[in-house]
Amino acid sequence: MGLLECCARCLVGAPFASLVATGLCFFGVALFCGCGHEALTGTEKLIETYFSKNYQDYEYLINVIHAFQYVIYGTASFFFLYGALLLAEGFYTTGAVRQIFGDYKTTICGKGLSATVTGGQKGRGSRGQHQAHSLERVCHCLGKWLGHPDKFVGITYALTIVWLLVFACSAVPVYIYFNTWTTCQSIAFPSKTSASIGSLCADARMYGVLPWNAFPGKVCGSNLLSICKTAEFQMTFHLFIAAFVGAAATLVSLLTFMIAATYNFAVLKLMGRGTKF
């Protein structure tokens, strides 16, 4: 078998939807977790530098930020493992579907995995194919563990609902920083607003970031404009935007996973001719 033919067979058996979704998932989670972690750190510095001089005022906020950062560590680890499992499940179900439709130009791993669903035969032994059959046996064992695509569909559906809430929550800091930036623009260009510059403020207490008895709790006028011009504010604002984009990319990847897995499961269930799940 030539190299070109081998590559062609691998491409035919590859689950492209799962591959794209996996890449998008890893990219989105990395963007969300990395940028979100640094954005929370930047927010902590801005609060303690400009909005409150008393540590007790923002002690609870710091504890919440640190808790969210630990959650981010766990989220990154979980999605790395779950994304790899979903990719393996994509190879598994795609190989089984192609075998049902009579397309045997699948990869060795795809054949090994699909054998656990369709009851296909194992490869014929030979000295030259010893390594190939070893890989097939490993994939066959993996297929027994992955042989519940309906459960993967259910778990992915529940995870998508949870991540939809995460996506909505990731928009909150973007909204707060955007409002602050808009206020700064009004201060920088007073001709665009009828309000006096001194009355234009950013109040962290209004968003529940600080308690109402925090002092000063808000920054107004030219002081607020100077904060908006700092590199810390600009970087934190853009990091939250990047984290929001990462959450959106992860949501799209989960939807892609769910659609592809549901389609493959439906095909196997309806056309598997006695397939057992």
Swiss-Prot record:
Q: How does it sit in the membrane?
A: Multi-pass membrane protein
Quote the residue positions with lipidation, kind O-palmitoyl serine: S199
Q: Listed disulfide bonds for this chain?
A: C184-C228, C201-C220
Topological domains on the Extracellular side lie at: 37-59, 179-238
Going by the UniProt record, its keywords in alphabetical order are: Cell membrane, Disease variant, Disulfide bond, Lipoprotein, Membrane, Palmitate, Phosphoprotein, Transmembrane, Transmembrane helix
- Report the transmembrane regions from the record: 11-36, 60-88, 152-178, 239-268
Which cellular components does GO assign to this protein?
A: myelin sheath; plasma membrane
Q: Which residues carry this modification: Phosphoserine?
A: S114
Positions on the Cytoplasmic side per record topology:
1-10, 89-151, 269-277
Q: Where in the cell is it found?
A: Cell membrane; Myelin membrane
Q: Which domain of life is it from?
A: Eukaryota
Sorted alphabetically, the Gene Ontology BP terms of this entry are: astrocyte development; axon development; central nervous system myelination; inflammatory response; long-chain fatty acid biosynthetic process; positive regulation of gene expression
S-palmitoyl cysteine: lipidated positions: C6, C7, C10, C109, C139, C141
Q: Which residues carry this modification: Phosphothreonine?
A: T116, T118
Q: Tell me one Pfam family matched here.
A: Myelin_PLP
Record's InterPro entries?
A: Myelin_PLP, Myelin_PLP_CS
* GO molecular function terms listed in the Swiss-Prot or TrEMBL record: structural constituent of myelin sheath
Keyword Cell membrane assigned: yes
Among SMART domains, the record links this protein to: PLP (SM00002)
Instruction: State the disease link.
Output: Defects in PLP1 are the cause of 'shaking pup' disease; a dysmyelinating disease.
Role this protein plays: This is the major myelin protein from the central nervous system. It plays an important role in the formation or maintenance of the multilamellar structure of myelin.
Which family does the UniProt entry place this protein in? Answer: Belongs to the myelin proteolipid protein family.
**Protein's UniProt name:** Myelin proteolipid protein
What is the originating organism of this protein? Canis lupus familiaris (Dog)
